[in-house]
């Protein structure tokens, strides 16, 4: 046991050893926000550059329909998944889309789609899910 007046030494040691913890270090230095294309925000708008098909990981065999999007706020390019049956048909190049996280573990990719961490929620300010279900038609810009 340390001495009677050793509280400062104990506290300083704890603080120094916390820097060995990866999660603490990343949080304190803001490394996760620096590396995040959305810069810490929950959603972002972007312009569709191209449509891409991404092969699902084993044991599944499918081509997941995704889009390459250039974010308006910082110009970074990301790949976003288009959820829903036939959803890719409602998205054209140069459309403005709203992107949000796909909901995977620890903010990472979900399921069998490798390297895709975002999904498309709106196309030209209209919900993609509404267009897929047939409730709303895509507006002509």
Curated annotation (Swiss-Prot):
One of its GO terms (molecular function) is structural constituent of ribosome. It comes from the Archaea. This is Small ribosomal subunit protein uS12. It holds the Pfam family Ribosom_S12_S23. With S4 and S5 plays an important role in translational accuracy. Located at the interface of the 30S and 50S subunits. GO terms for biological process: translation. The keyword Phosphoprotein does not apply. The gene is rps12. NCBIfam families: PRK04211.1, uS12_E_A. It comes from Methanosphaera stadtmanae (strain ATCC 43021 / DSM 3091 / JCM 11832 / MCB-3).
């Amino acid at each position: 046991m340390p001495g009677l007046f050793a509280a400062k030494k104990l506290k300083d040691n704890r603080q120094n050893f916390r820097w060995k913890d990866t999660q603490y270090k990343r949080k304190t230095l803001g490394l996760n926000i620096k590396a995040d294309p959305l810069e810490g925000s929950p959603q972002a708008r972007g312009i569709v550059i191209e449509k891409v098909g991404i092969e699902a990981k084993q044991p599944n065999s499918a081509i997941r329909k995704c889009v390459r999007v250039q974010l308006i706020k910082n110009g970074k390019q990301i790949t976003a998944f288009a959820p829903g049956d036939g959803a890719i048909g409602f998205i054209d190049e140069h459309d403005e889309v709203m992107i949000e996280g796909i909901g995977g573990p620890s903010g990472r990719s979900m399921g069998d789609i490798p390297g895709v961490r975002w999904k498309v929620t709106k196309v030209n300010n209209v919900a993609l899910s509404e267009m897929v279900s047939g409730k709303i038609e895509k507006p002509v810009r």
